[in-house]
């Protein structure tokens, strides 16, 4: 029997292709968080659901289902605090996530923010756009001259 897979947001084509190898895929085109009715429907009518951060699978959602057919909430993201894992497990639904999926991106953003603070790039960009740039350097600090966290 073919698994019915519900993906709650449009995801990269690589994800959709991989999911398509595992079963019949339905993709919800709306990019906003699902409402309660949609979440209940997903648990009742699909075997696997790929929710994202805004889809709050609470105890109330599980309790509102007549019969839960879903066996897996495969969360597309690292955090899963929007899913009541204990209640999901009590209903025979396993919960997974993608640990490490955003580690590189998080490090990139941290570096960008540190550089922006040291080099004052946001401030400098506003000054340039306002045609108020003067010969005074806004970029004299560097990361090697700074100490972070103590």
Give the positions of each predicted feature.
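Phosphate-binding beta-alpha-beta segment of Rossmann-like dinucleotide-binding domains, i.e.
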Residues: 91, 99-141, 146
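Hydrophobic alpha-helical segments, chiefly the membrane-spanning helices
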Residues: 149-150
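An N-terminal-biased, well-structured beta-alpha scaffold segment characteristic
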Residues: 1-96
């Amino acid at each position: 029997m073919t698994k019915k897979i519900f993906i709650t947001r449009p995801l990269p084509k690589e994800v959709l292709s991989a999911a398509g190898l595992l079963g019949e895929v339905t993709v919800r085109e709306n990019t906003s968080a699902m409402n309660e009715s949609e979440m209940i429907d997903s648990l009742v009518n699909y075997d696997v659901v790929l929710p994202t951060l805004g889809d709050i699978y609470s105890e109330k959602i599980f309790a509102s289902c007549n019969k839960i057919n879903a066996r897996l909430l495969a969360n597309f993201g690292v955090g899963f605090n929007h899913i009541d894992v204990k209640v999901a497990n009590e209903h025979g639904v396993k919960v997974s996530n993608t640990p490490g999926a955003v580690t590189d991106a998080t490090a990139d953003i941290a570096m960008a923010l540190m550089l922006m603070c040291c080099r004052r790039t946001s401030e400098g960009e506003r000054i340039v756009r306002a045609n108020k740039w003067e010969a005074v350097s806004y970029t004299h600090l560097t990361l090697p001259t700074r100490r972070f966290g103590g």
